[in-house]
Amino acid sequence: MNTTADASQNNNVGPVMRQGELAQAVVEAAEIDNPEKVIKVEDKLAYLRIQTNDEMILKRQTIEEMLGRPFSMNELEVDLASFAGRIDTHVEYIRFYHAKHL
């Protein structure tokens, strides 16, 4: 089964980020902001697929701390190539989730 088919058969959610400083900060923030979750990172050279099961929260403040500079959540859109699940965006956080579970 290929990865597209696999994606439709699980409850994984999370961003697909272009490689770079922001992607690394998002990986670190995902681990900090979701301590009870196992965060899976697939390095695809040009991008990172960052996933966990059911729900992932990324807080602006945590990403800002990882970057070491001020950060606005709309900056995420520039490097967000895609995402798994649904997305709910706010000024202070972004949430990836599933409306229905498999």
Model-found features: residue ranges?
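A short, surface-exposed helix-loop junction/capping segment
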Residues: 4-12
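Short, intrinsically disordered, mixed-charge
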Residues: 28-36
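Short beta-strand
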Residues: 39-43
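Helix-rich interaction surfaces within compact, conserved domain-sized segments
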Residues: 44-47, 51-102
